[in-house]
Amino acid sequence: MMRVHTHTRLCFLCVLTLLYHQCSHCHEGGSHHHHGHNHGDHDHIHSDLQISEMSCNGLSDRLVHGSQGEPAENEQRYYIHQLFCRYGQKDRLDFKGFQSLLLSLGLGEVRVVGLEHEDLGHDHVAHLDILEVQDGRHSHSAGHPHSHQNPNISHKTHQHSHHENEEHTLAEDVPCSKTLGTGATPPSVSEEHDHDHEHDHDHDKDSDHEHNHRHVTDSPQTQDHEHDHIHLHTHSHKQDSDVTQRLELDHDQKSREHAQEHNDLSDQNHHHHDHHHHKHPHPHLHAPESVVHTTSAMPKIQPSVPPELPANQTRRHRRPSKVKAHRGRNRTSVTVTQAVELETSGDDHEHSLQDHSPAQQQRGRREVPGSPAHGVLHQHEECLNLTQLLHQYGLSSDSLISPVQFTYLCPALLYQIDRRFCILHYHHVEAEEQVAPSSGWVWMWGFVSITIISLLSLLGVVLVPILNQSCFKFLLTFLVALAVGTLSGDALLHLLPHSQGDHDHNHGEQMEEEPEVDFLIKFDGVWKGLTALAGIYLLFIIEHCIGMFKHYSDQRGGLCHKKKKGEQAKIGRKLSDHKLNRRSDAEWLHLKPLTEGDGTTCEAGHNDTQMTELQPLDSPSKMPLNISDSDHPYEAPVKTEEDNVPKAKSKKHGHGHGHGHGHGHGHSHHGHCHSDQEMKDAGIASIAWMVIMGDGMHNFSDGLAIGAAFSANITGGISTSVAVFCHELPHELGDFAVLLKAGMSVKQAIVYNLLSALMAYAGMVIGTAVGQYTHNVTSWIFAVTAGMFLYVALVDMLPEMLHGDSEEHKRCEMGHFVLQNFGMLTGFGIMLLIAIFEDHIVLDFGF
């Protein structure tokens, strides 16, 4: 059959005027039209595979009635509607909602399965179920079928039945925007140029050239027209029947003029007319950013052909290269037409590749969203977080995901689920070798950290000149209690939970956010340690209250007894003085010097009149006084009895004064003074050695912990050093206070504190070596350290709080009790805060 291409060109020039007139009326009047415009590739960039939105005013029924993709379209729209209602807002998915969807699917971050689950299998659902058990969201019983879904999503059974218009009727539906459920264009997209023209090209009645293209309503058997252009451009304006009628009249008039100019086309059989591309401008010029969002894109894109194809369907295979070029030219920034063929009609529209202008061919090389831009390959073989996923699709974290964009993202989500990139087993994680820090940096940071912490022992020097004597005693009481609280709190709240493996010190490896876990479950070991501290504190309060009650009852009940006892002591003292005054100086020489043991007893009992009894003057055992036999190294002159009276009184007074101030008087008290000084030195030495050993073990354990942490990670070691510094500050001041209370000078206390601080270097060396050259020993180091801390706190320092200097405590016992409680509670609180927030104490220096 003859084809007249010249007249076809003239026909297109006429249609050009018609389309320009129709387009202007369409935009001004805002009416909906379906134009079956069968022209090929003009200067607009609409894709031939572009699928439009279906509006909510009933046109969707006419468009998809009888279509092969009708069930798929409605099913797709239904499930997208449900997902957007659950995770989206106003028919859009924001970043937070999409993130929740990814986490529900087990995507977006790498998660480690730490439980054995051979009986459950290794499918994706089983892994998600086990991860929920690990997170504490639910637990399994012995006979549990292990078929949970995400507990964060309410289980609802939506029963939907298909009616004639294939609209879903939900039995239980979440209230959502009606526009999405019916397939209408979302509000944010309705502003774009989405045209939905319906033009009936009714030419002259004498002509067989009828353009009545309702491609969707015509069945494939009756469609012999080889036209693949489906321009179903939806427009968001309301339909105006008056404007539509007026446009149809104008259209009929233009069609008649068109038929009169081209009468020779009336004899043509239009069923086999091939529309070739012609170089003429087209009024439908849309910017590349013109996006057609649709929830019904998938139904029109069918991978299979209709059951019955027309006879001229074989034309489709004659020029495959031109068809591919035509499809490749119509890629837009959002619609994906790659490797998809339109099969809803049996028409074919052939374009000549040579007819495309260079500008048109350049526009045809647009990339599909998600394809590598500028030749840069995207990372697909790893677990992608939401930001990476959106970036690969040309979106940002601020973008709102439309239903069409969501359909493009779905293959990536399915691929991530199928390849199991985001779920790993614990043995796979442990098998990955971690890059160990340099040994030089480990040793250097360890020594620097220990040196800074050890210098805290010099901090006590600053406190001595500032405070007076009375305030300093109260400060010492507070610091001792603070040391007890920090030591016992660090052992029970920090070290023991770490030794049990609740969480480790590798802070640098925990920078990524972990899924939220119940606060009580996450710090279960810390709460149990806090309960143990509560038991210690309760018994301390009970024992201290019992001692205070006993002290006050003794003061109240023994007041009269003490007065009576004081009067008897005065009478005895007078009699003793009278007896002593009757003795001469020669008789005083018969007094035996007190032995060291007597001096010790005298020091303990504070008895001023404790002496050896003199022999009576008329005693038969009285021997003549011989000065040479005297044990004294010097000679005493013999005085008269009158001169001896004041001397005896002065001797008695001097002896008593010597006991009160520790000064020796005469030959007899010299031995007692020597014994008291030795005892004092022995007591100081004992306390000093106890502090050196106790505090030294404490510093040694600190060095072990710091060395082990630095050997694992530089950043984690610095964080551990910060935690040690926080409890070493009150502990070193507490030790300084204990040494001062033992009778040491400030200089001696500083020296002993520095000696104990040297043990931290030894601990750091051992901890670093063990951490670098052994495996899984750090937890045992923490356990040993916790035992040492408890011993120092409960055996050495807590008794000092309970049984301190009775004279000082009796003066203001309630004040000391309040300070002790405040110090212990402060220490407990410091260690509790470190135990809870230590993962956030991370100092990243880029190592």
UniProtKB/Swiss-Prot annotation:
Post-translational changes noted in the entry: Undergoes N-terminal ectodomain shedding.
GO BP, sorted A to Z: epiboly involved in gastrulation with mouth forming second; epithelial to mesenchymal transition; intracellular monoatomic cation homeostasis; response to zinc ion; zinc ion import across plasma membrane; zinc ion transport
GO MF annotation, one: zinc ion transmembrane transporter activity
Catalytic activity: Zn(2+)(in) = Zn(2+)(out)
Membrane protein topology class: Multi-pass membrane protein
Composition bias type Basic and acidic residues, residue spans: 162-171, 190-269, 629-646
Glycosylation sites: 385
PANTHER family: SOLUTE CARRIER FAMILY 39, ZINC TRANSPORTER ZIP10
Name of this protein: Zinc transporter ZIP10
Name of the coding gene: slc39a10
